[in-house]
Amino acid sequence: MSMVYANIFMAFVVSLMGMLVYRSHLMSSLLCLEGMMLSLFVMMSVTILNNHFTLANMAPIILLVFAACEAALGLSLLVMVSNTYGTDYVQNLNLLQC
């Protein structure tokens, strides 16, 4: 495994560990999710460029589209929770059920 792949994998693991450690705050969880998506995007792009996968050129862009949708939904949920309760705790999400 080259150093590029090792660094990208390490970034993914650090984001995953941050997700496990800072799971009580919604903003921290969203930032860790974005870090995971960014490392997956870079890993996919580097793999496609190194192996010359011509059929998979659109896969990283599709991943970015899903990451943007996830970020928009997460931020709207963060705004709704912080306006309703004044904090960004994940435990407040259970109170939003109908």
UniProtKB/Swiss-Prot annotation:
Query: Where does the sequence pass through the membrane?
Result: 1-21, 29-49, 61-81
Question: A GO molecular-function term, please?
Answer: NADH dehydrogenase (ubiquinone) activity
- InterPro entries in the cross-refs: NADH_UbQ_OxRdtase_chain4L/K, NUOK/Mnh_C1-like
Q: Name one GO cellular component term.
A: respiratory chain complex I
- State the membrane topology: Multi-pass membrane protein
Q: Would you indicate the residue range of the signal peptide?
A: none
Give the UniProt family note: Belongs to the complex I subunit 4L family.
- Say what the protein does: Core subunit of the mitochondrial membrane respiratory chain NADH dehydrogenase (Complex I) which catalyzes electron transfer from NADH through the respiratory chain, using ubiquinone as an electron acceptor. Part of the enzyme membrane arm which is embedded in the lipid bilayer and involved in proton translocation.
Subunit comment for this entry?
A: Core subunit of respiratory chain NADH dehydrogenase (Complex I) which is composed of 45 different subunits.
Q: What is this protein called?
A: NADH-ubiquinone oxidoreductase chain 4L
Recorded source organism is: Odobenus rosmarus rosmarus
